[in-house]
Amino acid sequence: MKQIELPPRGLETLFGVHDQNIKYLESLLDVRIDARGQDVSIDGDPEDVVTAQRILEDFSELFREGRTFTDKELREAFAQIAEDRAFSLRDYFTKARFNPAGKKQVAPKSANQRKYIQAIQEQDVVFGIGVAGTGKTYLAVALAVQALMQKQVNRIVLARPAVEAGEKLGFLPGDLQEKVDPYLRPLYDALFDLIDYERVTKLLEKQVIEIAPLAFMRGRTLSDAFIILDEAQNTTSEQMKMFLTRIGFGSKAVITGDVTQVDLPTGKRSGLIEAERVLKNLVGIEFVYFTEKDVVRHKLVQMIIKAYEEHSNQKSHI
């Protein structure tokens, strides 16, 4: 058992209403934490006790500096430390979090998301591969917006393959814009979440931000741009090569996709799966992988994904 004394400032927030925050920390680390005033005792496995002590003392220090936290922020940080014991609270709250356009603060919610952000900041080409809901596209768009606002790039180009779920644009009703918009809607949603509506509209009108089907990139060279290819598992080998060779000087590219959700016709090779094999050892290119543990949607989504994966594995052994 470890006995520590914590300063009073922020202690009530740290523990939460009816000690709900501390109970959550106890469940994550399998420790017991009791407090009488400022005196706190921690009981459990020695390694877990040390981790719990560091969390409490680090948060107390941040509270002492005048920082404030919501219950959600506290619990997200608890979960990340439980996942990665080398996790730094101070770095997380002072470096990892960012506000791309002054509207909304963005923060990684898992170790893989932190790795992904760092990779995008440091490399010219990054592949984010994993199941839906892991923040691959949203974080890439957020970093693109930040790069644009900080004048690191002159424009943002967001692209998706225009063929998904077996539908071809030519067989859908309406004009081209009406046909294309549903496929690109997730990219618009991310932008509107990060930037005020009027500002996004102006940037789109000026083509500072461009959202288009992947086919529209053929024959172009994109310099000083932040380029994102979403749903890349639905590119063919030729399309992926075409996309990667569009990258010009001063540009950065992020490619996201889920290799378990390929909607290409039978016999067509996924460009994302091939790129993973062909490019994994090239300097300047990094692959970051996400699992169901990184899912940041409703907590049931993580459980649903895991259940389907287990079902798929069982079928493969029949």
Regions found by a protein language model. Name each.
Residues 1-12:
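Short glycine-/aliphatic-rich beta-strand segments at the starts of folded cytosolic domains
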Residues 10-29:
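Short amphipathic alpha-helix segments
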Residues 29-32, 287-288:
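A short linear hydrophobic-aromatic micro-motif
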Residues 32-35, 282:
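Short, flexible turn/loop "capping" segments at secondary-structure junctions
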Residues 34-93:
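Interdomain "pre-motor" coupling segment immediately N-terminal to P-loop NTPase/helicase cores
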Residues 39, 101-229, 233-318:
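Conserved helicase motor core of SF1/SF2 NTP-dependent helicases
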Residues 78-109, 121:
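Proteins enriched for Cys/Gly/acidic motifs involved in redox and nucleic-acid/cofactor modification
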